[in-house]
Amino acid sequence: MYAPLYIKTNNSLLESMIKIEDLIEYAKVNSIKALTITDNRMYGVMEFYKACMANDIKPIIGLEITMDGSKIVLYAKNIKGYKNLIKLSTISTERTITLEDLSIYNSDLVCILPYDSNNLYDTLKPLYEDIFKSYRTVKERETLSKDNLVYMNETLYIDKKDSEYLPYLWGIKDGIMVSNVKVE
């Protein structure tokens, strides 16, 4: 069963082009039986959960947090894990997440480190029973040990044509005038 692991929706303000209703429709059309969202807040979780359940899709609830400038993606295993995600999300609205926060709210969570954050693996391994390093390309995979390795690529749009709008979205987020956004 294929389930994309790192999907951000437009609930991660000015980071993604994906609307939950479009994501559900895409999953239905492509016979995807499980979906995850990994926004940087928990705002869209109920809408996502209800839409998945109404369409016979298994919802996987995740949260992207930042610690020491590195991204960490956490997934709830059950309701206790979900509550821990809510606590971490709340903390992240007030201040930066610390290692101590993660040690307090680590139970019933799966931790996947995006490739650029794999340096945190040894620091976080004692906290998580299920912790994985990720890669996006074959070249990246070759640089990592084979233990606890998963493929994970951040998904920020559904339709390829929407990718051209992302630099403008990010520019707005960074306070850059649209006319000054550099598009590659």
Sequence positions of predicted segments:
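Phosphodiester-processing cores and adjacent nucleic acid-binding clamps
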Residues: 1-184
